Amino acid sequence: MQVPSPSAREAASMYGTAVAVFLVLLVAVLQGLAPPESPLPYRIPLDPKGDLELSWDVSYTQKTIYFQLLVQELKAGVLFGMSDRGELENADLVVLWTDGDNAYFGDAWSDQRGQIHLDSQQDYQLLRAQRTPKGLCLLFKRPFGTCDPKDYFIEDGTVHLVYGVLEEPFGSLEAINTSGLQKGLQRVQLLKPKISIPALPEDRRTMDIQAHNVLIPSKTTYWCHLTKLPQDFPRHHIVMYEPIITKGNEALVHHIEIFQCTNQFQNITSFSGSCDSKEKPQELKVCRHVLAAWALGARAFYYPEEAGLAFGGSNSSRFLLLEIHYHNPTNIRGRYDNSGIRLHYTAKLRHFNAGIMELGLVYTPVMAIPPKESAFVLTGYCTAKCTQAALPPLGIRIFASQLHTHLTGTKVVTMLVRDGQEIEIVNRDDHYSPNFQEIRMLKKTVYVYPGDVLITSCTYNTEDKNEATVGGLGTQEEMCVNYIHYYPQTQLELCKSHIDPCFLQKYFHLVNRSNLGEYCTCPQASGTTCPQASGTTCPRASVPEQFASVPWNSFSRVVLKALYDFIPVTVHCNKSSAVRFPGKWDLQPLPEIISKLKEPTPRCPTSRDQSSSSLTVVNIGGGKV
């Protein structure tokens, strides 16, 4: 059947023909494999009001994702897709739109001006379209990789999903521009690991750590709530935890974490309020040990059946800090929340204690990112010397990981190196966002043995900064951390590094000399044993002040990058008491890498369905959206 194309220009560029396939309501397109019949297991709201809901499932054998988009109140169409950082410009899209007579479904893309173009290669395949009591439901599929330069390559890690709502008909697809649309983004891990779920013990009990009737603020807010375990609560193993989300708030609760406090304080002042509040007790700074973490799109987190995370007992603090990130960009008012996390635990301790270890960079200003950088990399090392000293002879097994940076982080990767050869990636996120952090189960267990090296690299974007961003605990400072979850637990709690401070002082002196002493970058008066260069007359400064004085030209940038890539490091091979394992940890050479892993290349589909070159017309309720 011949149908009118959106425009002659689009038809000519796409097909050379105006022939399209008419989709009868409730009838699936028969090309390719049949769509899954069971409900898709993963589900998130796309918009703050929950009018758009996405469900999906992953087929690793087909290397395909099945999507189901539920549109509760459809006006004139909807855009859905993916982009590198969550912009609707330069996005890979699928579009449902109407010209007033017919409804069309097609693979499209947007340019940097937000102009929509129909893709010459149709890789989103519509499988079913139907009206339901909840709204319009579209089921479609898309390969991970398409080898189409206009398409997004779906890979492990964070994916920035984007959407836009069309409120009026358009005569052609090219008449649509994203600038005037109601639009937004949602971050999610699409490629969920397919792992078996361990059986839970019959004696398990539950503990709900929840907020108490919080009036959700009208802006994005981190909410902190301090709670405590019962008096004389004995040692238990957490075997699973799951989110508790107040009904109706699913689109507003972005992520949740529970931190265990150290036993430094016998008592901590109760608190429930904004984490940025001046009334927040200073003692809460010791509540940094992650006990549980959930983010939008994640389901229950299970520990391996032979391991559990210990909490409670005489040597453990009773205090737990609940932190909830509320994301309310449309300023929805009058909504109260009691969300949190439900811990499932057992008194019958499992064979192994699970542990959490910090990899990456020490929180110190000697590690810094120059301003106006698009992709500056800093790297932290857990060296062979440390794993040799701290790990048991049979090694450890990593089963989950949580990556962490502050506001400028865009990519994080941890690599396992053995005998100078890169063995495998522990965890990697090429589209990392500090606004989406969750503990992720690994697709397969990673075994780490004494003498192995764990290298964690973070990439940062500081294009909007005018001064250097230094390392530290503050939100405006930076971090590079991978919290690995493993068993059996060892005494090693932190395995990180930073460059040798004295070499950094040589860098500052070199910058000062190259600029004829115009900029003051003299070392601080205390806290360092580095000798001060002769002939300096300016006042002494702290490392952040020194970085603030650097003139960021090509010379200072290139030299700092070379410094970080080649000079010796100080290794923090620390026990839980913050005491290092015995040994010499200063001026350690960087690990030598003699063999690198090959970068994965996207696999193109071996064959394409005939429908992939046809525009689909959707007949829904008389042919109109």
From Swiss-Prot:
The keyword Glycoprotein applies. It catalyses: dopamine + 2 L-ascorbate + O2 = (R)-noradrenaline + 2 monodehydro-L-ascorbate radical + H2O. Its cofactor is Cu(2+). GO terms for biological process: dopamine catabolic process; norepinephrine biosynthetic process; octopamine biosynthetic process. Disulfide bonds join C147-C604, C224-C275, C261-C287, C382-C495, C386-C573, C458-C480. Proteolytic cleavage after the membrane-anchor leads to the release of the soluble form. N-glycosylated. Pathway: Catecholamine biosynthesis; (R)-noradrenaline biosynthesis; (R)-noradrenaline from dopamine: step 1/1. Binds 2 copper ions per subunit. Keywords: Catecholamine biosynthesis, Copper, Cytoplasmic vesicle, Disulfide bond, Glycoprotein, Membrane, Metal-binding, Monooxygenase, Oxidoreductase, Secreted, Signal-anchor, Transmembrane, Transmembrane helix, Vitamin C. The record marks G32, L33 as: Cleavage. It is found in: Cytoplasmic vesicle, Secretory vesicle membrane; Cytoplasmic vesicle, Secretory vesicle, Chromaffin granule membrane. Residues 31-625 are intragranular. Cu(2+) A binds at H254, H255, H325. Residues 50-166 form the DOMON domain. It comes from the Eukaryota. It is a single-pass type II membrane protein. GO terms for molecular function: copper ion binding; dopamine beta-monooxygenase activity; L-ascorbic acid binding. Its EC number is 1.14.17.1. Homotetramer; composed of two disulfide-linked dimers. Catalyzes the hydroxylation of dopamine to noradrenaline (also known as norepinephrine), and is thus vital for regulation of these neurotransmitters. Belongs to the copper type II ascorbate-dependent monooxygenase family. This is Dopamine beta-hydroxylase. It comes from Canis lupus familiaris (Dog). The lineage of its organism: Eukaryota, Metazoa, Chordata, Craniata, Vertebrata.
